[in-house]
């Protein structure tokens, strides 16, 4: 299994026979090198989105049309994109599981908001979500944009993820200290990868507080387009 950061909250996850592009905001992402776009997209099988905000949906429609990839996510957002943009999609909802190239992807709760920009203001696109991605003997908890929430308790107990990809930049999501608290209290991760940080001055620039709060856990600060093998 390989997890590759695309900057901000974007990832490329190669698991089982699937290559998932998660929240692929490439164009305009200050951390993503535009001349390496093909490297990020090569072999992708699905686009997995957590919510509608532009720093997450980003290049979703362009990539879906260019590569013929289905967009996977919350029913409301995916259905709206299918109707508006004519792309393929797999819409489902909290508690549902879809199998993507042998990987089992279950949608779970997050606490944030979800909208896309429209001419008359925000267009609300269903609710925000996280995912449990199971395959190759591992379970990844992809938090999506979220704060700490009590639901993490049963989610950790039921799904037992060993890898956490946690939004931890603060201001719009939990910060590094809160992410460390959530990981300690609700999960038993072997590996934690922070995201939604370093992109703008408003967000946290270092994961040191996360590392300090999780002794005994491998906290990996991702580097853009450098694969992490699990």
Curated annotation (Swiss-Prot):
NCBIfam families given in the database record: PRK00685.1
Top-level taxonomy: Bacteria, Pseudomonadati, Pseudomonadota, Alphaproteobacteria, Rhodobacterales
Name of a matching Pfam family: Lactamase_B_2
Keyword annotations from UniProtKB, A to Z: Hydrolase
SMART domains recorded: Lactamase_B (SM00849)
Name the UniProt record assigns to this protein: UPF0173 metal-dependent hydrolase RSKD131_0588
GO molecular function: hydrolase activity
InterPro entries hit by this protein: Metallo-B-lactamas, RibonucZ/Hydroxyglut_hydro, UPF0173, UPF0173_UPF0282_UlaG_hydrolase
HAMAP family the record matches: UPF0173
Source species, domain of life: Bacteria
Assigned protein family: Belongs to the UPF0173 family.
Organism: Cereibacter sphaeroides (strain KD131 / KCTC 12085) (Rhodobacter sphaeroides)
Cysteines joined through disulfide linkages: none
């Amino acid at each position: 299994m390989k997890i590759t950061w695309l900057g901000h909250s974007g990832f490329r996850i190669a698991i089982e026979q699937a290559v998932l592009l998660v929240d692929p905001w490439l164009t305009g992402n200050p951390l993503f090198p535009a001349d390496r776009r093909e490297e990020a997209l090569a072999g992708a099988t699905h686009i997995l989105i957590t919510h509608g905000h532009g720093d997450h949906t980003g290049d979703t429609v362009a990539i879906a049309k260019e590569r013929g990839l289905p967009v996977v996510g919350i029913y409301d957002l995916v259905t709206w994109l299918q109707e508006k943009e004519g792309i393929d999609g797999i819409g489902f909802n909290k508690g549902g599981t879809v199998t993507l190239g042998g990987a089992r992807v279950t949608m779970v709760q997050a606490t944030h908001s979800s909208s896309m920009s429209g001419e008359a203001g925000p267009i609300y696109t269903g609710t925000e979500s996280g995912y449990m991605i199971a395959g190759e003997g591992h379970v990844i908890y992809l938090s999506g944009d979220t704060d700490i929430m009590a639901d993490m308790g049963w989610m950790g107990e039921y799904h037992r993820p060993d890898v956490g990809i946690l939004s931890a930049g603060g201001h719009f999501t939990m910060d590094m200290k809160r992410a460390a608290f959530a990981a300690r209290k609700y999960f038993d991760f072997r590996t934690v990868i922070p995201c939604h940080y370093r992109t703008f001055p408003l967000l946290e620039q270092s994961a040191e507080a996360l590392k300090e709060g999780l002794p005994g856990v491998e906290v990996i600060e991702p580097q853009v387009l450098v694969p992490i093998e699990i």
